């Protein structure tokens, strides 16, 4: 039997149980990874899944990477033989097998003796307000409502704010100067609410906000939980390498970015220096996954597996191999080199 399947069969959590079942019930399982879109009008990439010999078992998959789909009488003969046991070692993902055997071998060798992000930091999501536009105010709105500045906390609302090496007090001052809605109304339970805040909560915007799922399922509805001031922020969607930006202004962040809390004794400067290495760029590609439109997505569980600053000689064939591997993975997610 044969199916057209989403290309996320190469990385999605559901692909693990599916391919485990296929390997345990078919004598032959082949995946044809098609780099150029099968259906150009769709944002979804598609691959082909072929299985034969129902009732049998197999200890390997055949992954055939092809540039462009064309109609043929039978599946491609050539491909990479992927042992099921080795596929499991790669977190039951097929995407790493788009790389050459040399690149995979180097990745495993370097990663084995290197530190991963989860060894030096905790990575989580930011807070969820349930009504972002209501809980984030512009300075002019706060002034108009009579809400005191000490109740407003500078906030990173999305990845667009992650520019440069750090968010500084100058960054926050720029938000104020440009009257941007980057200030969270940060209220705490048990604190008496000023009259101006009560009026704001009882406004039409407040009445609408409290009907949202998140707001109506917390008490009190206007206290946003899980608000933290991390050491850094990490973009979870990116074109090139995800941005790791230091938090020098005690900002907080929504769940549109990841929050990074360093372990004791760790330095954000050292971490950023390591983050910029080619090997870490490759690790982001290997541990993350395509989102569509050329974007790379890095979930918290994927981010903690990213290898930090794996060392290869920058003048060596190893470094050239890493650079080529990064380029290969980006081509498969249709990332246009030179954009970011």
PLM regions: where:
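Polybasic, glycine- and aromatic-enriched phosphate-binding surface used to engage nucleic acids
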Residues: 96-316, 320-336
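Acidic, carboxylate-rich catalytic segments that either coordinate divalent cations
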Residues: 339
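Signature of N6-adenine DNA methyltransferases within the class I
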Residues: 1-134
């Amino acid at each position: 039997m044969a199916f057209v399947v989403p290309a996320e069969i190469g990385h999605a959590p559901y692909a693990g149980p599916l391919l485990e079942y296929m390997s345990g019930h078919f004598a032959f399982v082949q995946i044809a990874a098609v780099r150029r879109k099968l259906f150009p009008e769709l944002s979804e990439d598609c691959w082909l899944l072929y299985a034969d010999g129902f009732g049998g078992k197999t200890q390997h998959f055949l992954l055939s990477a092809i540039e462009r789909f064309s109609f043929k009488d039978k599946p491609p003969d050539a491909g990479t033989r992927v042992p099921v046991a080795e596929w499991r070692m790669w977190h039951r993902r097929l995407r790493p097998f788009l790389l050459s055997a040399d690149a995979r071998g180097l990745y495993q060798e370097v990663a084995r003796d290197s530190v991963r992000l989860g060894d030096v930091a905790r990575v989580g999501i930011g807070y969820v307000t349930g009504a972002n536009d209501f809980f984030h105010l512009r300075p002019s709105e706060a002034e108009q409502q009579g809400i005191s500045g000490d109740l407003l906390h500078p906030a990173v609302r999305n990845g667009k704010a992650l520019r440069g090496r750090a968010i500084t007090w100058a960054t926050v001052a720029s938000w104020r100067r440009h009257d941007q809605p980057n200030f969270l109304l940060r209220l705490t339970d048990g604190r008496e609410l000023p009259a101006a805040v009560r009026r704001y909560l009882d406004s039409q915007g407040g009445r609408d906000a409290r009907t949202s799922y998140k707001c109506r399922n917390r008490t009190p509805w206007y206290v946003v939980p899980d608000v933290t001031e991390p050491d850094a922020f990490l973009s979870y969607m990116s074109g090139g390498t995800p941005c790791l930006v230091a938090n020098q202004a005690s900002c907080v962040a929504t769940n549109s970015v990841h929050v990074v809390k360093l372990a004791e004794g760790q330095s954000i400067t050292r971490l950023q220096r390591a983050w910029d290495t080619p090997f870490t760029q490759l690790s982001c590609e290997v541990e993350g996954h395509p989102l569509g439109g050329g974007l790379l997505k890095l979930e918290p569980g994927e981010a903690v597996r990213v290898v930090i600053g794996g060392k290869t000689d920058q003048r060596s064939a190893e470094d050239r191999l890493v650079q080529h591997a990064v380029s290969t993975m980006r081509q498969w997610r249709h990332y246009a080199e030179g954009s970011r």
